[in-house]
């Protein structure tokens, strides 16, 4: 019997791309509007997402930092999108964050049901 090697593309690969997207969004917000809070939040959350992706690359069961970061951003940016109705940047980051939360929750369910 062949052992299941996991998903075709591990979650941390997407996690590094997500971290880069968040950090780049903060940099673009600063460059276009001069928004220092956007720069600070983008670099902070992008750094946390990068740390979470790195932890996932070392131990696929260590999903907590990544899940907390993407879940927090999904909530914050989801509310901004709901209130403003503007897709950029709030809708984009909220959508990307939700796409990261779903496999993170699935990973937790997988971990908790392991014997």
Swiss-Prot record:
Gene this protein is translated from: Tmem14c
Membrane-related topology note: Multi-pass membrane protein
Pfam families on file: Tmemb_14
Protein's GO biological process: erythrocyte differentiation; heme biosynthetic process; mitochondrial transport; regulation of heme biosynthetic process
Entry-linked PANTHER family: TRANSMEMBRANE PROTEIN 14, 15 (PTHR12668), TRANSMEMBRANE PROTEIN 14C-RELATED (PTHR12668:SF4)
Keyword field: Heme biosynthesis, Membrane, Mitochondrion, Transmembrane, Transmembrane helix
Name of the protein this chain belongs to: Transmembrane protein 14C
Transmembrane residue ranges: 8-28, 33-53, 63-83, 88-108
Localization, UniProt: Mitochondrion membrane
Biological role: Required for normal heme biosynthesis.
Superkingdom to which the source organism belongs: Eukaryota
Entry's family note: Belongs to the TMEM14 family.
GO cellular component assignments: mitochondrial inner membrane; mitochondrial membrane; mitochondrion
